[in-house]
């Protein structure tokens, strides 16, 4: 699947930054210079959404994040033009601050998280916006108000107990929705955090740039650190991991920089790597 200049139903851009599956099993693909592409469950052709001069189109070609809310709307975080909401019933995009709601400070979106009432939007050097889903009001928190050492937020995760996990260039923070204050967890060091998820067993997985992957048990606070070991084919394939995903069958997969993608083997506590040698088009994978 790639961009074909001669086919208007192909991908709009070969630089893929984000892949997201919605509740209808449709696939959304965010790109670096081609906006967002959509393919329905049984489709073979992509619909392209790019900025146009007419109203209610996406605000940017540079798509960083995609998330679906409880009503089936797709929220699109861009790297240079704020946050858009796509309504699948009307087929239009609305930008926060342009078409609905007050202006959001989150013009450079790095992370999105959907809960029952809000969309949490982490920004580049500008803290966090909480956007009320129904009236689009925006509540802003600076990095200082949240207790962060710096104001960028690269990863957001809500665990089964309602705790919010934040990742940035200073490591991992965890906090409470009611107080909106966060505490840095020193167990993860001063790692640059790319992604955080909670798996179906309740473990917190943390992906870093240059420092591998952490697996953390919130119950007993035990932590395990996985890194690439030269010559070890069943170790993590790269220490720079951009994304973590769990499949419906409970498999944990990792996208890496120059290491292809890895699957965690739970029983053996090791990894299987899939790279250009196994047919991937590139050894650098994103979201």
Please give the residue ranges for each predicted region:
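Carboxylate-rich, polar loop motifs that coordinate divalent cations or form catalytic acidic clusters
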Residues: 1-287
